[in-house]
Amino acid sequence: MSEATLSSKQTIEWENKYSAHNYHPLPVVFHKAKGAHVWDPEGKLYLDFLSAYSAVNQGHCHPHIIKALTEQAQTLTLSSRAFHNDVYAQFAKFVTEFFGFETVLPMNTGAEAVETALKLARRWGYMKKNIPQDKAIILGAEGNFHGRTFGAISLSTDYEDSKLHFGPFVPNVASGHSVHKIRYGHAEDFVPILESPEGKNVAAIILEPIQGEAGIVVPPADYFPKVSALCRKHNVLLIVDEIQTGIGRTGELLCYDHYKAEAKPDIVLLGKALSGGVLPVSCVLSSHDIMSCFTPGSHGSTFGGNPLASRVAIAALEVIRDEKLCQRAAQLGSSFIAQLKALQAKSNGIISEVRGMGLLTAIVIDPSKANGKTAWDLCLLMKDHGLLAKPTHDHIIRLAPPLVISEEDLQTGVETIAKCIDLL
């Protein structure tokens, strides 16, 4: 057997031996994938209900995206931003018009987009709001996940997984301030900080429209309108992290659109499905006024805006538009959540909660009703029966299939979950 076709057993053995152990994957090996289907090296078929954390909204190896990738790869892959390239210019025009913003800054990973936004917010605070130098504050909310870099983990309240032995953290970047906690979904928690003497130094608030890693936590419908109003009142930027929730996943192009706030965010972050899972592509969207705080040399990336990524991202967004995947996610998501709630009612309390929006959903498992079995145990059973999902926070299973999944496969997924719950 060649290295290109390792067995599942050999793959796991080599990864355990040669790779850092910074992940704890389910014991399944991806060999090839198409749409919502995945095959392991031995040919077993699985349904993908994770979508690489919503990076493959368009489905694995979408032909339109792969065609764009292969054609561009034979023409030009990298210029760096030391020179212009004609594909990035097309992407910049396309993505800003697609999402209704004035300007874009391209990066690669979602975490890079977050760091870019934090830097941009600080610069804006000093250059536009006249915050005293080195006093700018950026606030988040408890339970957030914005990535693994220092700025992102400084915002985190998940100490054991995100912060243990990584300190000290970035000053004035936190999801709380002094004695004030900031609970997600509680806009009033920002008020004591914004109205304190230090409130004038708050440059930005960064939030997820739905908290993903926290277990698909959907805020009250009036949360973002209230936060947006507070930001306008106190001259604070609102940064919305749509890296996991955006690009059709919840049934709207941006999840923030569900909340009908009077003002759109000042800064929006995109990643993951921006390339359909083909390449690392991310970006920061904002206004000319805010983005003008970056000047040549103040921020950048060798690979950000490269022609290969730019061409792929255009194709990925074309798929969302042309295949009406926002509408599809809304329609299928409504049916999926209804089926999960029906399953909850028959689960004898094993499923304690169903939550989500569109095709970004989760079920909460109560181990006390499941013979002490956990969400991990249920995911292992589901894997054995051909359905792939991953727990988060021990007792929650995120369910987020590609938006192109068929109704039949979605139904099969629900039936598989039901069967595996009976086997717990």
Curated annotation (Swiss-Prot):
Positions of crosslink type Glycyl lysine isopeptide (Lys-Gly) (interchain with G-Cter in ubiquitin): K390
UniProt pathway: Amino-acid biosynthesis; L-proline biosynthesis; L-glutamate 5-semialdehyde from L-ornithine: step 1/1
EC number(s) given by UniProt: 2.6.1.13
Role description: Catalyzes the transamination of ornithine into L-glutamate gamma-semialdehyde, the second step of arginine degradation.
Organism this protein belongs to: Saccharomyces cerevisiae (strain ATCC 204508 / S288c) (Baker's yeast)
InterPro entries xref list: Aminotrans_3, Aminotrans_3_PPA_site, Class-III_PLP-dep_AT, Orn_aminotrans, PyrdxlP-dep_Trfase, PyrdxlP-dep_Trfase_major, PyrdxlP-dep_Trfase_small
Protein name: Ornithine aminotransferase
Family statement: Belongs to the class-III pyridoxal-phosphate-dependent aminotransferase family.
GO terms (BP aspect): arginine catabolic process to glutamate; arginine catabolic process to proline via ornithine; L-proline biosynthetic process; ornithine metabolic process
The reaction(s) this protein catalyses: a 2-oxocarboxylate + L-ornithine = L-glutamate 5-semialdehyde + an L-alpha-amino acid
GO cellular component, one term: cytoplasm
Keyword Transferase: yes
Pfam families, A to Z: Aminotran_3
Keywords on record: Aminotransferase, Cytoplasm, Isopeptide bond, Pyridoxal phosphate, Transferase, Ubl conjugation
Regulation: By arginine and urea.
Gene: CAR2
SUPFAM superfamilies: PLP-dependent transferases
Cofactor: pyridoxal 5'-phosphate
Main location: cytoplasm
N6-(pyridoxal phosphate)lysine PTM sites in chain numbering: K272
Keyword Transferase: yes
Location in the cell: Cytoplasm
PROSITE patterns membership: AA_TRANSFER_CLASS_3
GO molecular function: identical protein binding; ornithine aminotransferase activity; pyridoxal phosphate binding
NCBIfam families with a match to the protein in the record: Orn_aminotrans
More about this protein: Present with 72000 molecules/cell in log phase SD medium.
